[in-house]
Curated annotation (Swiss-Prot):
Residues 835-897 form the R3H domain. One of its GO terms (cellular component) is Golgi apparatus. This is FKBP12-associated protein 1 homolog. Residues 76-87 have a biased composition (Polar residues). Belongs to the NFX1 family. Residues 1-173 are annotated as: Disordered. The modification Phosphoserine is found at residue 33. PROSITE patterns: R3H, ZF_RING_2. It comes from Schizosaccharomyces pombe (strain 972 / ATCC 24843). InterPro entries: NFX1_fam (IPR034078), R3H_dom (IPR001374), R3H_dom_sf (IPR036867), R3H_FAP1 (IPR034077), Zinc_finger_PHD-type_CS (IPR019786), Znf_NFX1 (IPR000967), Znf_PHD-finger (IPR019787), Znf_RING (IPR001841). Residues 15-29 have a biased composition (Basic residues). The gene is fap1.
Amino acid sequence: METSKNPSDLPKKPANVKKNRRRFQKSQKKSISPSSGSELPNFKTTISQNNEEVKTSLKEDSSKFHPSASAPIFVPTSSVQLNVSKNNGHKASDIVDAVSSKDEELRKHAKGEGKRSKNRKRSSKHSEKQAVDLKSSNSSQETSSSKGSVNNKSERSREAKSRMPKNSKEIKKGLDLSKLDMTSRMIVELKNRLYECSVCTDTINPSTSIWSCGTCYHVFHLSCIRKWCKNSIEQRNEDAWRCPYCQSNQTETSLHYLCWCGKQEKPEFVKNLVPHSCGDPCGKTRGQDCEHPCPLLCHPGPCPPCTATVEKFCLCGKESIHARCSNISKVNTEPFRCENVCDELLPCGEHTCKKRCHSGLCGACFEPINAKCYCGLHSKTYPCSSLPSPSISKKDENGSVKEWFGYYSCNNPCTLFFDCGLHKCSKTCHPISETRAHCPFATDVLTKCPCGKEDISFLLKGHERKSCSDPIPTCENICGKLLSCGHRCKYKCHLGSCGTCSETLTIPCRCTANEVQVTCEQLQNGFIPTCERLCTILLSCGRHQCNKKCCSGYSKAQTRLARRPKGAKLRYHLLTEEFEEEHICFRPCNKKLSCGNHFCQHMCHRGPCPRCLEASFEELPCTCGRTRLYPPVACGTPIPDCPYLCVLPKSCHHPQVKHNCHPTSEPCPPCPYFVKKRCLCGKHILENQPCYRENVRCGELCNKLLSCKTHFCEKLCHPDGECESSCKKECGKRRMYCEHVCQSPCHAGHPCDERIPCKAPLEVSCECGRIRKKVTCDASYDNPDPQHKVSCTLECSQQQRNKLFAEALNIKTDRRSNDVAQYTKSLLVFYGKHSDFADEVESLLRNFVNNKASSFRFPSMRREQRAFVHMFAKLLGLESVSFDPEPKRNVMVYNKGEAKLPNMLLKEANLYHLQHPEIPLKPDSLLGPEEENATASHIDGSSNASDSGYNAFVLKELLKEVNDESAIFSVLDDIVDFNHLTWSILFGENYIILKPLNTDLIVNKTGKLVALRPLVNRRLADAGIASRCEICEINDKNEIVKTRSQRIHSKKKAFLSLVPDKSIGVINRYKELATEL
């Protein structure tokens, strides 16, 4: 809170405040005048002045602090001295103190009324002694006045209680804290018990131990914050914890209850002070640049800005300004600068700083200086700070000595002669002395040969050089001088420089895999030895190989690969592996992104490419346009799912099937309507064909004459022009010599080649007919009448003689009829239709019996094939059991040691029975009920007495109205067992009955219907006719007597309905677990 030095600095009082104040002063008979004087008043005096100014205005502005406009808030008096935001020209702390002072004055006023009533009673007693007449009147007046004062007092107390808030919620509703600063708001909330702890969300009482965050100044219960600190440190395993309000890191773990300024521990609660305050001046420093302590009493929240006036100098210290300390602290980033030149002496000691007022050192001197070279012929400009060290050069010109400072070498050759006057200096520009240098070729300087190994006097055989111009002799030794590369010169002693090094070195190549021989001169010229080895290391992308010759990163890659982990850690290691710079792939990735429209522009990399960042700023509508995505739309986004129906027109012009809107790339559901269509061959018009089916076939043979003009097309119904292009059938013409048909490929337009022997099979026999043999015809142009003779053997004559003897004695000798009688009619009928399968089963079972194995498993097969295996195994004395559900149901055969093979093969028995049909066969009933009813057995694998009587199908849950029998028969026409029977169809209101008529030939009608029901149900559901097909019993009046329920072999009952999209094998997989064919 800022204090004013002059009463005139106080805020001006509004007119209504002055009037109310005068009335209050008259009623209390007190005069309140503000302190005057030029000196800075006491802080408490200034607060009292502000309180007096606001005191009377509370009645009009009380609605801002309390919902009741008739009474202000009664807050205990406290010394709140803060610099807060202004509220209608008054300070928030003044408003709080004014409320407390108003409370005190009301209490004093109530006490004064009580004292005056007592004085009136005493005066009434004294008047009774002096005048009896006046006693009654005076006493009555005093009594009435006392009663009136007491009544007034009680009314005022009741009004004050009614104006007092009932709870903290009502106080909070009546306060407008939005215009107060943080400190004032905290004081009001703490005094009125409105401040809540952010940990437990309970109110903070003035007498409760607290802790305040030094960053956000938020207040918490001390017990709550200690528990928060302990749990946070234990969970995070760190020394620091976070403030629950501002999340700032706190390192202090021993938390104590201190006052706001931190000077007093466990401050006592004083009624007239700010809660949790020690009552002493705060004394905190405000910022790094401020050295003045806070003058306010101990308070919550941040300290107000410093109002002290300080003097601040400019950067160069020549000028200064006076300003508030807080304002100076705020503008630390923009220091005060004057307009003067620094003028400080620079480090060179000669020049001064020419910069404008600045901070820090002046820096190096950049004053330009013109410097000469050592020889004095050239000069250039240097900054003063970078001027090199000078050297004194002296030169004698025409008897006078010229002297100057040389700072650098101009690199030009020196033109001065040595003292001999014959040789010139060969050095570049250098400092010059006044005297000439001694000649390096002088006889007193040069006493040895150039390599330094022999004396010149020795080489000249006792003679000496007389002058520096005499030739210098050389010796026969190797020079041996140390070259710049470190090797020695290998030439003979010579004059001048040694030249280049010719030493041959063996060093590793660039990839360090091989060694290469090079000269030292090549290495000095930058030659890099390489080999022809190709680097096969994978690059950083993991797709491409290096394929460089003699790669310099090969050895680094080997080291990197050796450090790779193995196992599961390798996958994560590859994501963060650092590659050598030689093996970083710089090719563009160029893979197609997930959007399908753009390509990856990153460098070739491991793992998947990032998602496409392209976006469209146009709306993306669905096909019908009623659902759309608004921009920006990421590239590759599919069109949105539309909940509305599809509006695409159909080419057939039938009504559209109800389905949701979809992209045009997806076709609409096929048209379910039935129409008439002409078949592909054009012979027939087929009815009840689905509209979506384009190619309709009648199933008849084409029978069009082929190009050979002899044979006819044997393809089934097909479009025109798709007949067999070239005839590859047998010729079929009668041969000339044998009358068999020609078996050569069709050769229309050419006669048959009679030179080729006929390959037609023939069966010839001996004269008695016992021996039969199959041969080929072999008739040809060269052998028109081939002879195929079979001679009789001795056995033939014996059998012929025995036959004649048996006939004479009337004895039957044919035992084959007994062997054929062992077989049943069902076995021989099945063999006539499926001879290959029956031969294979017979061969397997005969081998199984001969090998004396205990069991044999057949592969999965169809129902009628399993029935044949069961019947034939029973005939052989074997036991057979079916396992596994459809379509992998198979038969297991067991040999219990009672097997017996028939004398005649099934093939022979069938052939002999065809020749002698009068032979009686074994009845099917003798093979047991399982084989007798194998082709029409119950789907559960067992027959129950309750299943008898069922004689028809009933179709329920009809999907569409059907009034034509052909619609049902066209769907079930390709079921073989269904076509063997004659059916009658009866139409009801909500059902259709399918009743077989010729059921007398069926041994087990219920088993037959049970076997047919799943396939019939499936076909009718796929055709959209009925979703349920059940077995029922109908009487002579065509009324349904009972319906067979579906039984499932499991512990729990289940009612499964046929799903059209599933196969028959998954309709009821529990039923297939039972023993079945």
